[in-house]
Design a protein with these regions (language model features):
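Positively charged n-region of N-terminal signal peptides that target proteins for export
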Residues: 1-6
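Bacterial N-terminal signal peptides
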Residues: 8-21
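Short, low-complexity N-terminal intrinsically disordered segments enriched in polar/charged residues
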Residues: 20-62, 165-166
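Short beta-strand edge/turn micro-motifs at domain boundaries
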Residues: 23, 117, 137-164
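A solvent-exposed, acidic/Ser-Thr-rich amphipathic alpha-helical stretch
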Residues: 35-38, 56-111, 121, 135
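A short, structured loop/turn motif at beta-sheet edges
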Residues: 109-116, 129-132, 144-150
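A short hydrophobic beta-strand element
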Residues: 114-124
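A short acidic/glycine-rich loop-to-helix N-cap element
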Residues: 129-135, 163-166
Length: 166
């Protein structure tokens, strides 16, 4: 009557028991990834706030001070490589504008180990020193590295979105 042998039942029991820790580990991994994504989003918000405040001190805290850090802003004419150059680029940009308004209209974050990337769309409004306003949307990619529980930026690229004229 019994369709399963005692040996088959024992093997099936072992397989099911083995899946419980694996399932638990996957659940913990997903929870960690969710936590990392939330922390990357928070780091992105700190970055945006530093830009809006034109605060180089705040910018200094969100970036990794590495020779491989990179910056390409929406008004850039060159790629800036290395933290010292990145910091100077931000100082220059902060000096060009009396006000910066920036918000994330869309954001997608992914983590993989100690590296994360956030891509999305920024809405930007700049008040120049001459009183003229420059408004645009930009595709943005930010890359972060996890260091001691903190996610620090190692690359920022923002590219203006060109819209076809009607």
């Amino acid at each position: 009557m019994n369709r399963f042998s005692t040996g088959a039942i024992a093997v099936l029991s072992l397989l099911l028991a083995a899946e419980l820790p694996v399932g638990r580990a996957l659940s913990q991994e997903r929870a960690q990834e969710r936590s990392d994504i939330d922390r990357v989003k928070a780091a992105s918000q700190v970055f945006i706030a530093a830009i809006a405040a034109r605060d180089i001190g705040a910018m200094d805290k969100v970036w990794a001070h590495e020779s491989y850090a990179t910056f390409i802003g929406p008004l850039s004419t060159t790629i800036v490589i290395g933290w010292d150059g990145v910091k100077k680029a931000w100082e220059m940009r902060f000096g060009q504008f009396d006000r910066v308004t920036i918000s994330l209209a869309e954001s997608h974050v992914r983590t993989n180990g100690r590296v994360a990337w956030a891509v999305g769309v920024e809405r930007v409004e700049l008040l120049r020193k001459d009183g003229k306003t420059l408004s645009f949307d930009a595709f943005v990619t930010n890359v972060f590295e996890e260091r001691g529980g903190r996610w620090l930026m190692v690359s920022h690229q923002a590219t203006p979105i060109f819209r076809a004229a009607d």
